[in-house]
């Protein structure tokens, strides 16, 4: 059996301000740093010892991973970073407050942008300084391969090859891996290993800073699944994500 741990980054500064973040590289809030530390403690208490870890190119995920590993005294394990684990790109919505967008466009339209499976938000122009084509961390990637906006479907198509080609083989080789990433890139992995439908995945909310632990067999069949949190804490965290566009 193999242990796969998925960890959505702790609360970011823009989570706190309820803004669309996407590929904008904001850091963790103080609460987010505490969530990352608590995630490390929860894994320690559960006897989970990752042998390798994966994260995105964005500091809120990287710092969540670093804090969690440091808490576990596992700062020395191999860490692999990939842009394919980045959050969904929210295009021209990045930096805008979700509730303000509801006032302008209506809750239905904003929820379509947030939650519809295959409808991307308005794109970010390629000459915008925040476009990934203009960011040196992506200079090794062809501009045409970098997103200006993404639907959840687009995010899945970006993330899954990396999971299949790198994360899963490392899991089978080392026995236990930790993936610290983002709500939508993690939803891509969850959809794949749980074989969820489009309707099921758009309704799934992954809370910040709470490890989701799968035990799987050689074929990624799930033998057990659990969040490392008590029921009340988990419920509040999931509701917090679900209510981001509600007045």
Curated annotation (Swiss-Prot):
<dbReference type="Pfam" id="PF00300">
    <property type="entry name" value="His_Phos_1"/>
</dbReference>
<feature type="active site" description="Proton donor/acceptor">
    <location>
        <position position="87"/>
    </location>
</feature>
<comment type="pathway">
    <text>Carbohydrate degradation; glycolysis; pyruvate from D-glyceraldehyde 3-phosphate: step 3/5.</text>
</comment>
<dbReference type="InterPro" id="IPR001345">
    <property type="entry name" value="PG/BPGM_mutase_AS"/>
</dbReference>
<feature type="binding site">
    <location>
        <begin position="87"/>
        <end position="90"/>
    </location>
    <ligand>
        <name>substrate</name>
    </ligand>
</feature>
<feature type="binding site">
    <location>
        <begin position="114"/>
        <end position="115"/>
    </location>
    <ligand>
        <name>substrate</name>
    </ligand>
</feature>
<comment type="similarity">
    <text>Belongs to the phosphoglycerate mutase family. BPG-dependent PGAM subfamily.</text>
</comment>
<feature type="site" description="Transition state stabilizer">
    <location>
        <position position="182"/>
    </location>
</feature>
<feature type="binding site">
    <location>
        <position position="60"/>
    </location>
    <ligand>
        <name>substrate</name>
    </ligand>
</feature>
<feature type="binding site">
    <location>
        <begin position="183"/>
        <end position="184"/>
    </location>
    <ligand>
        <name>substrate</name>
    </ligand>
</feature>
<dbReference type="GO" id="GO:0006096">
    <property type="term" value="P:glycolytic process"/>
</dbReference>
<keyword id="KW-0312">Gluconeogenesis</keyword>
<dbReference type="GO" id="GO:0004619">
    <property type="term" value="F:phosphoglycerate mutase activity"/>
</dbReference>
<dbReference type="InterPro" id="IPR005952">
    <property type="entry name" value="Phosphogly_mut1"/>
</dbReference>
<dbReference type="GO" id="GO:0006094">
    <property type="term" value="P:gluconeogenesis"/>
</dbReference>
<feature type="binding site">
    <location>
        <position position="98"/>
    </location>
    <ligand>
        <name>substrate</name>
    </ligand>
</feature>
<feature type="binding site">
    <location>
        <begin position="21"/>
        <end position="22"/>
    </location>
    <ligand>
        <name>substrate</name>
    </ligand>
</feature>
<feature type="binding site">
    <location>
        <begin position="8"/>
        <end position="15"/>
    </location>
    <ligand>
        <name>substrate</name>
    </ligand>
</feature>
<dbReference type="InterPro" id="IPR029033">
    <property type="entry name" value="His_PPase_superfam"/>
</dbReference>
<protein>
    <recommendedName>
        <fullName>2,3-bisphosphoglycerate-dependent phosphoglycerate mutase</fullName>
        <ecNumber>5.4.2.11</ecNumber>
    </recommendedName>
</protein>
<comment type="function">
    <text>Catalyzes the interconversion of 2-phosphoglycerate and 3-phosphoglycerate.</text>
</comment>
<feature type="active site" description="Tele-phosphohistidine intermediate">
    <location>
        <position position="9"/>
    </location>
</feature>
<dbReference type="InterPro" id="IPR013078">
    <property type="entry name" value="His_Pase_superF_clade-1"/>
</dbReference>
<keyword id="KW-0324">Glycolysis</keyword>
<keyword id="KW-0413">Isomerase</keyword>
């Amino acid at each position: 059996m193999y242990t796969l741990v998925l960890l959505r980054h702790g609360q970011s500064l823009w989570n706190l301000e309820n803004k669309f973040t996407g590929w904008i590289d904001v850091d963790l809030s103080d609460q987010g740093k505490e969530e990352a530390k608590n995630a490390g403690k929860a894994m320690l208490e559960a006897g989970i010892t990752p042998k390798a870890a994966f994260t995105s190119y964005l500091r809120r995920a990287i710092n969540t991973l670093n804090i969690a590993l440091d808490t576990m005294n596992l700062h020395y394990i191999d860490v692999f970073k990939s842009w394919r684990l980045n959050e969904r790109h929210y295009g021209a919505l990045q930096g805008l407050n979700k509730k303000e967008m509801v006032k302008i466009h209506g809750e239905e339209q904003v929820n379509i942008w947030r939650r519809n499976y295959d409808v991307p938000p308005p794109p970010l122009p390629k000459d915008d300084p925040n476009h990934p084509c203009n960011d040196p961390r992506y200079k090794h990637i062809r501009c045409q391969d970098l997103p200006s906006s993404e639907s959840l479907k687009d995010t899945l198509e970006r993330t899954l090859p990396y999971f299949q080609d790198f994360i899963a083989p490392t899991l089978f080789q080392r026995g236990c891996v930790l993936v610290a990433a983002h709500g939508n890139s993690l939803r891509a992995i969850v959809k794949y290993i749980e074989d969820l439908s489009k309707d099921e995945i758009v309704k799934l909310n992954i809370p910040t800073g709470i490890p989701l632990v799968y035990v799987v067999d050689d074929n990624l069949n799930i033998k057990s699944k659990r969040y490392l949190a008590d029921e009340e804490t988990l419920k509040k965290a999931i509701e917090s994500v679900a209510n981001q566009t509600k007045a």
